[in-house]
Amino acid sequence: MRRRQLILGVGDVSGALAFTLGLGWWQSRNRVQSPAALLPLPIGEMNFALTSHLGEPVRPADWVGRPTMAFFGFTWCPDVCPTTLSEISGWLEDLGPDADRLNTVFITVDPERDTQQVLADYLANFDPRITGLTGSLAEVERAVAGFRARFEKVPRDGDYTMDHTAGVFLFRADGRFASIIDYHEDRSFALPKIRRVLS
């Protein structure tokens, strides 16, 4: 997959400026925005309606009250997505019972192909505590906008692939953005970030 990965090394909100700079090019090419305008919204301020791979309706307000770990991707992704979902599964296993307190979600950026059933079949390969989310393109775009993430449909050889933000988003139980886990970030750094939002 041709991808422009979001490479971040933030440990907490104090490091989030690097995240904002990594996203700013596509959100404000011709206008100036404050760094705060480029951070993910608090979950309670997001506004989208998606469907889980189990067929349940999901809105961001449902997540408030528990820490959230979220990742954007798609099931046809050859490398970044299965690798990251495998890493997330490993983190959840390492966290033990504490992992049950997390909302752990995989939000597709390819709703055209990633139906509820496709997501269900795909996620059967990973930790069952990961919830897949799909919906209309408009609702996926609303979710991506709330997270201040990005995605792009890229034509390829008569078909297409998807570019997308590759980091894992972490939010505190009150819905405030906490940090990003970078693609392929070492477990010794990733797990403490997750434990901080659980504390």
Where are these regions (language model features)?
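A short beta-strand-turn-helix
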Residues: 49-68
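Thiol-/selenol-based redox modules, centered on thioredoxin-like
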Residues: 157-199
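Short, small/polar residue-rich loop motifs at catalytic or cofactor-binding pockets
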Residues: 43-45, 67, 163-165
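Structural microenvironment flanking redox-active thiols in thiol-disulfide oxidoreductases
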Residues: 83-143
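Buried hydrophobic packing residues in well-ordered domains
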Residues: 55, 74-77, 88, 119, ...
